[in-house]
Amino acid sequence: SGLRGHRTGGSIHFVINNQIGFTTNPKFSRSSPYCTDMAKMVEAPIFHVNGDDPEAVTHVAKIATEFRMKFQKPVVIDMCCYRRHGHNETDEPAFTQPKMYKAIKAHPTTVAIYSKKLVAEGTLTQADVDAMQARFRAHLDSELAASEGFKPNKADWLDGRWSTPGTDRLLY
């Protein structure tokens, strides 16, 4: 990232750290304490933030953006969170990580935690939260219904110069 002629002016690397590989315990998945330790080789600052705290995530994202803009160097955000369900429909993470997933099952969702906070401070009412969730669910349902008859357009990125590879002459 600091090689002359190849600088990008910095980049923001956002790690959604669910603390687990497909079936690998974190202590067996790397030789360093954090999954973001590789960023130390380019001296990028690393911010670790709790994924259950949307305001903290937003705050850290703003700091990272300001750092990148001011110093034009890479920065890393390590959002520590968890995957409530498996990697896909066939994965049952409780088989390989039973203790972790027992704790996750007992832990409230990020939406529940943040909604409770907003209601407690008077920013929203529970009726507001319920209405927002109902609207979002209705949106998801309508998008799912729309996708059932969806036919993608022909890949237009293969038109033009790339439609006949090898026929254009390279100019040097």
Q: Model-found features: residue ranges?
A:
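Gly/lys/ser-thr-rich phosphate-binding loops in alpha/beta enzymes
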Residues: P54-E92, K117, T123, A127-D128
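Short, conserved secondary-structure transition motifs
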Residues: I16-T23, R83-N88, F136-D141
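Conserved thiamine diphosphate
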Residues: S32-V60, K102, A106-D128
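Flexible glycine/proline-rich, aromatic-decorated loop/lid segments
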Residues: G5-G10, N25-E43, M79-A112
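Beta-strand segments within the central parallel beta-sheet cores of soluble alpha/beta enzyme folds
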Residues: G9-F14, V76-M79, D130-A131
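Thiamine diphosphate
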Residues: S1-D37, P45-Q72
